[in-house]
Amino acid sequence: MDEERSSMLPTMAAGPNSILFAINIDNKDLNGQSKFAPTVSDLLKESTQNVTLLKESTQGVSSVFREITASSAISILIKPEQETDPLPVVSRNVSADAKCKKERKKKKQVTNIISFDDEEDEQNSGDMFKKTPGAGESSEDNSDHSSVNIMSAFESPFGPNSNGSQSSNSWKIDSLSLNREFGYQKLDVKSIDDEDVDENEDDVYGNSSGRKHRGHSESPEKNGAHSVTQAGVQWHDLSSLQPLPPGFK
């Protein structure tokens, strides 16, 4: 009974060493402290085991240091290469070329827009000229017609049968054609009054020229000059009239 109680005591005791007393294993190293004193062989074994453990630990630490130094050396070598790398210069040139291309595209687009606007303005102006009501002719045609009529009015007094009555009639016909056929604005009242005065004076000059032909024979050159003065009376004011010859009464 005492042996059984003594075997039960280690199980109730606290601490890991108490369990080793109750368990008996074939391996002596695991049985814990033996009752006998340790021999020299046991001490040598333990020392060799400790040495091997130290070697393994030192090898592991050395391998770790080697890996760290290798990684740090690689990082140090990579950094200066990146600083001296010519790639950033190439990227700047490429960016400058891209900017130049963008500016050229913008300039081209602006010119195209201006050309389109000009075409639209020309089309609109053409439509406006087509839509404007009138006599069916452009301003250039009307100006041509008016210039032809005025030249005919100038040329009529210098014809072979140039008299004051004929020139006045031609002026009336031209004025009617300008006022009725081509739809121009009518002449002012002042110009009409001046024309009436000119016609009366032309009649007076015509009668006087008839008397001169009866009394005195004059050359055709003088008649031509007289008709020129009559044409000048039609187109100019009374102040531009030539004085009468001294033989006229």
Swiss-Prot record:
<feature type="compositionally biased region" description="Low complexity">
    <location>
        <begin position="156"/>
        <end position="170"/>
    </location>
</feature>
<feature type="region of interest" description="Disordered">
    <location>
        <begin position="109"/>
        <end position="171"/>
    </location>
</feature>
<protein>
    <recommendedName>
        <fullName>Putative protein SNX29P2</fullName>
    </recommendedName>
</protein>
<feature type="region of interest" description="Disordered">
    <location>
        <begin position="188"/>
        <end position="249"/>
    </location>
</feature>
<feature type="compositionally biased region" description="Acidic residues">
    <location>
        <begin position="193"/>
        <end position="204"/>
    </location>
</feature>
<feature type="compositionally biased region" description="Polar residues">
    <location>
        <begin position="226"/>
        <end position="242"/>
    </location>
</feature>
<comment type="similarity">
    <text>Belongs to the sorting nexin family.</text>
</comment>
